[in-house]
Swiss-Prot record:
Name of encoding gene: RPS5
Cross-link (Glycyl lysine isopeptide (Lys-Gly) (interchain with G-Cter in ubiquitin)): K45, K203
UniProt KW Transferase keyword: no
Known function: Component of the ribosome, a large ribonucleoprotein complex responsible for the synthesis of proteins in the cell. The small ribosomal subunit (SSU) binds messenger RNAs (mRNAs) and translates the encoded message by selecting cognate aminoacyl-transfer RNA (tRNA) molecules. The large subunit (LSU) contains the ribosomal catalytic site termed the peptidyl transferase center (PTC), which catalyzes the formation of peptide bonds, thereby polymerizing the amino acids delivered by tRNAs into a polypeptide chain.
PTM (free text): N-terminally acetylated by acetyltransferase NatA.
Subunit structure: Component of the small ribosomal subunit (SSU). Mature yeast ribosomes consist of a small (40S) and a large (60S) subunit. The 40S small subunit contains 1 molecule of ribosomal RNA (18S rRNA) and 33 different proteins (encoded by 57 genes). The large 60S subunit contains 3 rRNA molecules (25S, 5.8S and 5S rRNA) and 46 different proteins (encoded by 81 genes).
Protein name per its UniProtKB record: Small ribosomal subunit protein uS7
Length: 225
């Protein structure tokens, strides 16, 4: 194109788009529905809202104030002393199921067992299973234990008070040991035996393995005061 030629004007027809106006529903969404959509529930079933720790000394060590969807937070609770008190209590119970040698590291299997256990508890008791678990742990933590004092031939047993964190640790261990032993060579699954153990412990029944062990520890401590 030479310098004398004028540039050709190109006319384009642009379609005018009307401004979008959002549609407003005539009936607003109820607050209950909005809360249900935003609330975090364990396995999308069980709410943490009304769960209560009835023992004042264990409130800071039974973690139910941080809701979770699944019992696996991948947290590094072992890096610092006492940090495991911040671990959700359902996850601590799940981790305790992996303590037997052949179950080490099988977290997905343990999570499935806990999910099935909570369903069984809800069917049998018609209660929030998280509350049943918290009550069971509260009832099975021994308040008194014994320790060795002295050395050599003069060693003896001395009764001592148990710290809140150790009470929770022992309660979780006793509950899972009782469920594991009950499921061994039994037609019942470990989810069923764990559900029975938790329900009996929450009631304070002497049929619970954990309750019997707790009473035995406290009885021995009482005789060594």
């Amino acid at each position: 194109m030479s310098d004398t030629e004028a540039p050709v004007e190109v006319q384009e027809d642009f379609e005018v788009v009307e401004e979008f106006t959002p549609v407003v529903l005539a009936t607003p969404i109820p607050e209950e529905v909005q809360q249900a959509q935003t609330e975090i529930k364990l396995f999308n079933k069980w709410s943490f809202e009304e769960v209560e720790v009835k023992d004042a000394s264990l409130v800071d060590y039974v973690q139910v104030r941080q809701p979770i969807f699944v019992a696996h937070t991948a947290g590094r609770y072992a890096n610092k002393r006492f940090r495991k008190a911040q671990c959700p209590i359902i996850e601590r119970l799940t981790n305790s199921l992996m303590m037997n040698g052949r179950n080490n590291g099988k977290k997905l299997k343990a999570v499935r067992i806990i999910k099935h256990t909570l369903d069984i508890i809800n069917v049998l008791t018609d209660q929030n299973p998280i509350q049943v678990v918290v009550d069971a742990i509260t009832n099975t933590g021994p308040r008194e234990d014994t320790t060795r004092v002295g050395g050599g031939g003069a060693a003896r047993r001395q009764a001592v008070d148990v710290s809140p964190l150790r009470r929770v640790n022992q309660a979780i261990a006793l509950l899972t040991i009782g469920a594991r032993e009950a499921a061994f060579r039994n037609i019942k699954t470990i989810a069923e035996t764990l559900a029975e153990e938790l329900i009996n412990a929450a009631k304070g029944s002497s049929t619970s393995y954990a309750i019997k062990k707790k009473d035995e520890l406290e009885r021995v401590a009482k005789s060594n005061r």
